[in-house]
Amino acid sequence: QYSNELDLALLKIQKTHAINRLPFLELSNLRKISIGDPVLAIGHPEQGGFWTLTTGTISSLIENFQSIPGKDVFQTETSINRGNSGGPLIDTYGDIVGINSMIARKGKNNVAITDINFSIKSTVAVKWMNSVGHPFHYATPKVTYKNETDSIVDNAGIVPVPKQDKIPI
């Protein structure tokens, strides 16, 4: 099934003996996403032949994008191209927060612009799946033994550096 307005499609995977071993990511219910949050986009550029991982942040939260009711999107400067359009926009917890879908190349009066990309919010995809007869239920949050939410940033060993005051020259 396909939604032309939302640019979403639902694909059926044929059952095989390996179906239970397919890796997957969870869809986020977006309880904690906000402007400035880091995100990742995964893709496969058409001409490059390599898988790519690009990083960026949530720049803006937009409701009813292009005047289409329910088409809520994130604006992100995460690099989106034809190779990762349709792929996941992932938060630091490894959950899908959006589906990469649109790239703005030109502004008013044909002025060239870069790094203005849009991803449909995962909650929009879930509402659409439910509306076409494929009910979806969110998974429970992943919790570690410390009772803290498990984060990709934590698992990667990335240590945040505190902001420091600038030293006058």
Predicted regions and their residues:
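C-terminal cap/linker of serine protease catalytic domains
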Residues: 17-21, 45-46, 96-167
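Catalytic nucleophile loop of clan PA
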Residues: 79-100
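Short peripheral tails and domain-boundary helices/loops at the edges of structured domains
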Residues: 59-72, 127-131
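Conserved active-site neighborhood of the chymotrypsin/trypsin-like protease fold
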Residues: 1-49, 70, 135-140
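Short, conserved catalytic or interaction motifs in soluble domains
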Residues: 4, 63, 87, 101
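Flexible glycine-/small-residue-rich
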Residues: 12-15, 43, 60, 78, ...
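Extracytoplasmic
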Residues: 4-8, 20-22, 34-35, 51-58, ...
